[in-house]
């Protein structure tokens, strides 16, 4: 922007021209304005709001971390708004969280808080929590030591650490689909090549990987139990086949097992249980069983991998909150976590059955689904041709009902993820009736 001539400014502000000259010299010395000989005096662009905004936008394009797809951004923005019904939300409702147990664990932690140094933690995590996780893993047939366990700020954080600290650039990631990992960009930030294996075709994973057998830098990412979003699980035979193939071709497996403790029938073993050569990197979290805000998960891997990740961790954030780790440890030590799990499984199974009963009454002619034996989700796939994006926006704008459409998880089916974990039964019923009404209308 060009500023008026000195004479005009002196008249406009009723001051001496010398005052204007000195003011211009001062502003120019500070960099606010600049003079072009023969042209005039101009305000520097960086003071222009539009210019600043454009510059920030330009700089953000340089980021190695891609932004989420628009639908995911919108869901993330609305998920904290209590005025909506969140029929797809992937967390426990407030009534299912262990408030009393958490309060007691926090009180126990506070009683010996003076023993804490409150300095920076190491990258491995709280020793007592790592030790008790080792004990629990042993009871599930996974025999590891403290040196094989690292505490993280949740499962997704664990995957991010593996992406930058274990997998090389331009790696090939073979993963099951649909998967919540598709709603993130965690494997895209380092130019990883993503190869999808449909969950219902997992028996063909060997054939698919064989096409890339000459690529040295590759890994398998898989959710073996109660996949998010479909709720499906691998059979024990499928798990054995995957680990056998992994060992034969020296391909690491990233096992994302966040719903490991939420089962409604006899639990099945993790892939890590069959791991004899240390090929499986096992990931889990307390976010789905206690609360997302607790932000505590863990990685089980070979000592060498854990050492590498801990070093990377110290370059990023110096470790997870020691207080959160101590609270989780207290819940595990006094067995209140296990008591909470017994009740949680019972309530979630009951809520699952409530949702399935409504689906059977309303949707059996227009959709199909499977009965999950654990986790949070029912995967609803429509038999009829329907515009899922249109359904998403109609329910959002007219009914304040938020659904997670299947396409954000990499699904090509006309599908939505339903959750029985977050909303009350009353809201579940209301939302399903509204979805049915709009589907029939469309």
Curated annotation (Swiss-Prot):
<dbReference type="GO" id="GO:0008483">
    <property type="term" value="F:transaminase activity"/>
</dbReference>
<dbReference type="InterPro" id="IPR015424">
    <property type="entry name" value="PyrdxlP-dep_Trfase"/>
</dbReference>
<dbReference type="InterPro" id="IPR015421">
    <property type="entry name" value="PyrdxlP-dep_Trfase_major"/>
</dbReference>
<dbReference type="GO" id="GO:0003677">
    <property type="term" value="F:DNA binding"/>
</dbReference>
<dbReference type="GO" id="GO:0009058">
    <property type="term" value="P:biosynthetic process"/>
</dbReference>
<keyword id="KW-0238">DNA-binding</keyword>
<dbReference type="InterPro" id="IPR036388">
    <property type="entry name" value="WH-like_DNA-bd_sf"/>
</dbReference>
<dbReference type="Pfam" id="PF00155">
    <property type="entry name" value="Aminotran_1_2"/>
</dbReference>
<dbReference type="GO" id="GO:0003700">
    <property type="term" value="F:DNA-binding transcription factor activity"/>
</dbReference>
<keyword id="KW-0804">Transcription</keyword>
<protein>
    <recommendedName>
        <fullName>HTH-type transcriptional regulator NorG</fullName>
    </recommendedName>
</protein>
<comment type="similarity">
    <text>In the C-terminal section; belongs to the class-I pyridoxal-phosphate-dependent aminotransferase family.</text>
</comment>
<keyword id="KW-0805">Transcription regulation</keyword>
<dbReference type="GO" id="GO:0030170">
    <property type="term" value="F:pyridoxal phosphate binding"/>
</dbReference>
<dbReference type="InterPro" id="IPR015422">
    <property type="entry name" value="PyrdxlP-dep_Trfase_small"/>
</dbReference>
<dbReference type="GO" id="GO:1901605">
    <property type="term" value="P:alpha-amino acid metabolic process"/>
</dbReference>
<keyword id="KW-0032">Aminotransferase</keyword>
<feature type="DNA-binding region" description="H-T-H motif">
    <location>
        <begin position="6"/>
        <end position="25"/>
    </location>
</feature>
<feature type="domain" description="HTH gntR-type">
    <location>
        <begin position="2"/>
        <end position="46"/>
    </location>
</feature>
<keyword id="KW-0010">Activator</keyword>
<dbReference type="InterPro" id="IPR036390">
    <property type="entry name" value="WH_DNA-bd_sf"/>
</dbReference>
<feature type="modified residue" description="N6-(pyridoxal phosphate)lysine">
    <location>
        <position position="288"/>
    </location>
</feature>
<keyword id="KW-0678">Repressor</keyword>
<dbReference type="InterPro" id="IPR000524">
    <property type="entry name" value="Tscrpt_reg_HTH_GntR"/>
</dbReference>
<dbReference type="Pfam" id="PF00392">
    <property type="entry name" value="GntR"/>
</dbReference>
<dbReference type="InterPro" id="IPR004839">
    <property type="entry name" value="Aminotransferase_I/II_large"/>
</dbReference>
<keyword id="KW-0808">Transferase</keyword>
<comment type="function">
    <text>Positively regulates the expression of the NorB efflux pump and negatively regulates the expression of the AbcA efflux pump. Binds specifically to the promoters of norA, norB and norC and abcA genes. Could also have an aminotransferase activity.</text>
</comment>
<dbReference type="InterPro" id="IPR050859">
    <property type="entry name" value="Class-I_PLP-dep_aminotransf"/>
</dbReference>
<keyword id="KW-0663">Pyridoxal phosphate</keyword>
């Amino acid at each position: 922007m060009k500023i008026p001539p000195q004479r005009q400014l002196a008249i406009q502000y009723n001051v001496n021209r010398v005052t204007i000259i000195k003011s211009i010299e001062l502003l120019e010395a500070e960099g606010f304005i600049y003079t072009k000989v023969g042209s005039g005096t101009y305000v520097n662009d960086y003071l222009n709001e539009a210019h600043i905004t454009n510059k920030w936008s330009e700089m953000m394009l340089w980021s190695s971390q891609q932004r989420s797809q628009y639908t995911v951004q919108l869901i993330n923005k609305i998920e904290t708004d209590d005025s909506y019904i969140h029929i797809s939300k992937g967390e426990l409702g407030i009534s299912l969280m262990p408030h009393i147990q958490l309060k007691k664990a926090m009180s126990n932690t506070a009683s010996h808080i003076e023993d804490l140094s409150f300095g920076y933690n190491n990258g491995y995590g709280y020793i007592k929590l790592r030790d008790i996780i080792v004990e629990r893993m042993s009871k599930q047939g996974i025999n590891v030591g403290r040196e094989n366990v690292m505490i993280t700020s949740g499962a997704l954080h664990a995957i991010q650490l593996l992406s930058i600290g274990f997998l090389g650039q331009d790696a090939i990631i073979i993963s099951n689909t649909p998967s919540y990992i598709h709603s993130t960009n965690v494997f895209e930030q380092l130019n990883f090549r993503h190869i999808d294996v449909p969950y219902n075709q997992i028996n063909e994973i060997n054939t698919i990987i064989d096409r890339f057998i000459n690529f040295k830098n590759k890994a398998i990412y898989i959710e073996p139990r109660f996949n998010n979003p479909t709720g499906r699980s691998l059979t024990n035979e499928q798990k054995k086949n995957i680990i056998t193939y992994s060992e034969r071709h020296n391909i690491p497996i990233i096992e994302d097992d966040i719903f490991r403790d939420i089962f409604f029938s006899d639990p099945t073993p993790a892939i890590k249980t069959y791991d004899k050569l240390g090929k499986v990197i096992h990931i889990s979290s307390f976010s789905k069983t206690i609360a997302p805000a607790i932000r505590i998960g863990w990685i089980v891997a070979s000592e060498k991998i854990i050492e590498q990740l801990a070093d990377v961790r110290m370059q990023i954030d110096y470790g997870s909150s020691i207080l959160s780790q101590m609270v989780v440890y207290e819940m595990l030590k006094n067995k209140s976590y296990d008591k909470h799990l017994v009740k949680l499984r019972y309530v979630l199974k009951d809520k699952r059955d409530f949702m399935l009963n409504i689906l059977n009454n309303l949707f059996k002619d227009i959709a199909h689904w499977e009965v999950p034996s654990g986790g949070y989700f029912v995967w609803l796939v429509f038999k009829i041709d329907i515009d899922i994006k249109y359904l998403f926006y109609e329910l959002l704008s007219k009914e304040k009902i938020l659904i997670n459409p299947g396409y954000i998880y990499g699904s090509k089916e006309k599908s939505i993820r339903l959750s029985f974990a977050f909303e009350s039964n009353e809201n579940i019923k209301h939302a399903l009736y509204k979805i049915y009404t709009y589907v029939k209308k469309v």
